[in-house]
Amino acid sequence: MGRRKKMVERVTTLMNDPQRIRNIGIVAHIDHGKTTLSDNLLAGAGMISKELAGKQLFMDSDEEEQARGITIDSSNVSMVHTFDNEDYLINLIDTPGHVDFGGDVTRAMRAVDGAVVVVDAVEGTMPQTETVLRQALREHVRPVLFVNKVDRLINELQVDSQEMQIRLGKVIDHVNKLIKNMNPEKFKAGWKVDAAAGTVAFGSALYNWAISVPMMKKTGVSFKDVYDYCKAGDMKSLAEKCPLHEAVLDMVIHFLPNPIEAQKGRVKVIWHGDENTEIGKAMTHANAEGDLAFMVTDISVDPHAGEVATGRLFSGSLTRGMEVFTSGSARKSRVQQVGIFMGPERLEVDKIPAGNIAAVTGLKEAIVGSTVTTLDGMTPFESIRHVSEPVVTVAVEAKHTKDLPKLIEVLRQVAKEDPTLQITLDEETGEHLMAGMGELHLEVIAHRIERDKNVEITTSKPIVVYRETIKKKTEPIEGKSPNRHNRFYIYAEPLDTEIVSAIKEGEVSMNLPELERRQKLIDLGMEKEEAKGIVGIFNSNIFIDMTKGIQYLNETMELVLDGFEEVMRAGPLTREPVANVKCVLVDAKLHEDAIHRGPAQIIPAARQAIQAGMLMAEDSLLEPYQKVFVQVPQLLMGGATKELQGRRGIILNMTTEGDLAIIEARVPVAEMFGFAGEIRSATEGRAMWSTEFGGFDVVPSSILNDIVGQIRERKGLKKELPKASDFLSM
């Protein structure tokens, strides 16, 4: 207990000195060794025993994670490392590498200032490496590089000392190429990774050794020595001379920014308020005496303490009993406990100052992305944007009817813990639908519901999530209210792809100041009058009011937008969500008496005009795609390409590396079910493959009617396809 008590004391002392804090994430492609690295860093810092490190998977504290051997959630831990005779506090988050859990990476990146990017020396940079690096740079998180599994390069691939250095150089060049393409300004500002400068370390997380140029100078161990030790299989001596935690954590402390340095540049990226206000200045300087500004990046459930909100404290200090506001809620909450993480355990402390990662209970209203503050009316932080969208759905039912109320509560909880999961109730069938990033994501959530929440459930076969869209512009369509006293004239047309991208990237939203939003849209090619008339943005669809001087329209616009949102949630063709549509209101006739233009009149009138307009504009479907990357011996390449093309896949690129072929393809998600088994048999089990979200594309007309028919049948809709007149005669 003595050692642990001492550790807690060191952590709580250092919390108060932002110069000596580093908030970092560890990111990588699946199986490149993040969690093993995290565990050995903890062992080096005296948090877990050295013998267990790497096997204990301390950070994978969830049974599901240990059974599957992958990290599913992000884990937090605080530890102390001594560098140049000074103690430093390192708050570390280990993130998942599997594409289905990319949402966790996005959220973790909001909490940290620096990232250790782990790349397997044998496999090199992989698709998920690119994705996590892009997420880090988008959040202005500075990267350093750790090239892992160097021993495999020497012992499995039998490369000589010179070839080893060439291959490691290639990995560094590729990572720099990615940084340069994704963020040229940061690259110019010195964010590239450079072995000579010390921002790259090489080693083996499993065997607990690592080397970097500063480390070589310190220990006198050269690349040649590393090669000889690995060849001789003497990893133990190497680990004694060049301990992993020393090389990596020294690099982190020396090159990654402390909260004060980081927040100077990061605050303006993640917060769009006025930097010259008191709260703006407090956040830019990580001022512990300022108003509280805390961003929630994760919510978990503790069986004893209830909901625990973890996040980054940008200004002010968190103390027990303080009253706070949560964005999106008018009610105040009272903070019950504040604490920090030590692996999966939460340690209570009295006070946590700005610049730290904190865990708080008592914030009933908070969800992931919430801004928690003591300042009423504070501009909230930018919402956290996820790189992928949910593309696969399953229907969930309780096995025993008595569990239904519990299931509803559990689904609400699960959706709160994992914002990349979408839970909806199908009003017509009464089923609960769970949409996620992929098959594995939904499997894990289903297991978790049964295991942690003790509710037995049955799930349907996975169903693909489609989007409805349109192909051409229509004339204005008249929508009449049921009492015939109100009329709206609305036309629909496809929204430009540049504008759709800007909405998805968060560059255009209703939260932006109006003039800034207008200018952005004009720059993207929208006409000035249209940009001025935008009154609603929902998902990737917009509603524009081009009318002039219509009486009572102001007070009914909210209801018109309700009608618009209803259609965008469930389009007329298949009741699937709508994407990339622009609806324009050109005229309206409204009854002068407010009683005759209530919700029951206005919403249906707007809804019908938009539904009919979409059907006249050639309503069509978009289907989700996945990019698939397959590594396979060249001799078996034919089997792999045949398997991909047989699934309506398009081969985008083929390259060779040694005797391996690397195939990059784009395949519809609908065709990807059962792919794992089939690709194994097509390549004698020798293919390595991974996927990432590949966007949406129009369903080929040859199969459109079949798919529409299947969706309508599944949802219990009429077999015959709807016509515009069905909506206008209502």
From Swiss-Prot:
Major location category of this protein: cytoplasm
Organism superkingdom: Archaea
Gene name, Swiss-Prot/TrEMBL: fusA
Database matches in PROSITE patterns: G_TR_1, G_TR_2
Function: Catalyzes the GTP-dependent ribosomal translocation step during translation elongation. During this step, the ribosome changes from the pre-translocational (PRE) to the post-translocational (POST) state as the newly formed A-site-bound peptidyl-tRNA and P-site-bound deacylated tRNA move to the P and E sites, respectively. Catalyzes the coordinated movement of the two tRNA molecules, the mRNA and conformational changes in the ribosome.
Phylogenetic lineage: Archaea, Methanobacteriati, Methanobacteriota, Stenosarchaea group, Methanomicrobia
Gene Ontology molecular functions: GTP binding; GTPase activity; translation elongation factor activity
Residues carrying Diphthamide: H596
HAMAP family attached to this UniProt entry: EF_G_EF_2_A
Binding site for GTP: 28-35, 94-98, 148-151
Subcellular location: Cytoplasm
Species the sequence originates in: Methanosarcina acetivorans (strain ATCC 35395 / DSM 2834 / JCM 12185 / C2A)
tr-type G domain residues: 19-228
This protein's record includes keyword GTP-binding: yes
Any one GO biological process: translational elongation
Keywords carried by this UniProt record: Cytoplasm, Elongation factor, GTP-binding, Nucleotide-binding, Protein biosynthesis
Family that this chain belongs to: Belongs to the TRAFAC class translation factor GTPase superfamily. Classic translation factor GTPase family. EF-G/EF-2 subfamily.
Protein name: Elongation factor 2
InterPro entries found in the cross-reference section: EFG_II (IPR041095), EFG_III/V (IPR035647), EFG_V-like (IPR000640), EFTu-like_2 (IPR004161), G_TR_CS (IPR031157), P-loop_NTPase (IPR027417), Ribosomal_Su5_D2-typ_SF (IPR020568), Ribsml_uS5_D2-typ_fold_subgr (IPR014721)
NCBIfam families found in the cross-reference section: aEF-2, small_GTP
One GO term describing the cellular component: cytosol
Record-linked SUPFAM superfamilies: EF-G C-terminal domain-like, P-loop containing nucleoside triphosphate hydrolases, Ribosomal protein S5 domain 2-like, Translation proteins
